[in-house]
């Protein structure tokens, strides 16, 4: 997948009474959106690892910002949100980031994250932290990092992305920037088993 690419992230808290069937419909309801122009890949992450702040992560790679704009206003997405998403979701974080790498060719686990930084942090400092994340990953256990800065200033976080692995146990090799006053200030994440939607 040639970049840069737009990556749309959804980190979801489900309502307590959600049934397995409703959860399946939430995930599978995204599948028809794969046919939309500019959609390159759709996947999901289950929040089973202890670092997870949310239950489920959904992610969509799109060709560019124009494809993201079309995706975000498409009637199929509106139907999905009304019928499958909103009835079962308690709250969620949505973010759009610019990435230069797509997903790993094959993966069985992922660490989906959104990071915030102090307001006086420059974009080059955010990019440097993301490059450090990519450089510090244990290449023997992790399959790749697809991360970047927010596409615009309306986003709730400054950076986000995905780290891919073969299995959830390999995600322990992920090394995020420390959460302190000098670096990242807030993190939301979903980590665990992951798969593309076919």
Tell me what each language-model feature is.
Residues 1-56, 63-73, 87-198:
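Short S/T/G/P-rich N-terminal loop/turn motif that feeds into the first structured element of a domain
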